Amino acid sequence: MKTFKKYYELPTSPDQVYLALTNPNTIALWTGSPAEMSTEPNSEFSLWDGDICGKNVEFEENKKIVQNWYFEGITDDSIVTFKLHEGKRAGSTSVELTHTNIPDDDYEDMMHGWDEYYFNALIDFFEEEGE
């Protein structure tokens, strides 16, 4: 099992990033797929037509999100933590992402997925929104 940690800078405020990560209607806008999401601890979530699913563990509005992602055949908790901070540039947000207990065989795909499908999609969404 491996851990992935990376910082991403998004061109918007922490409250807008939090909304984009927790509101199912906003998630559908940047992913292009329906989403099931709630900010209730212990609620189930589903993204990208069920390709990503798990349980919401903890929320600190506009600051932190903790989720347990499910991997087929893996019983260990795979914890994803998003920590939101004011970014270095005015009006931006630094997102500290930590994803623990990634199965070795899935690690490269997960790294690519975080960059390409998750955070590049969010950056594109906020850049288009700002135009």
Please tell me what each predicted stretch does.
Residues 1-36:
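Hydrophobic ligand-binding cavity/cleft-lining segments
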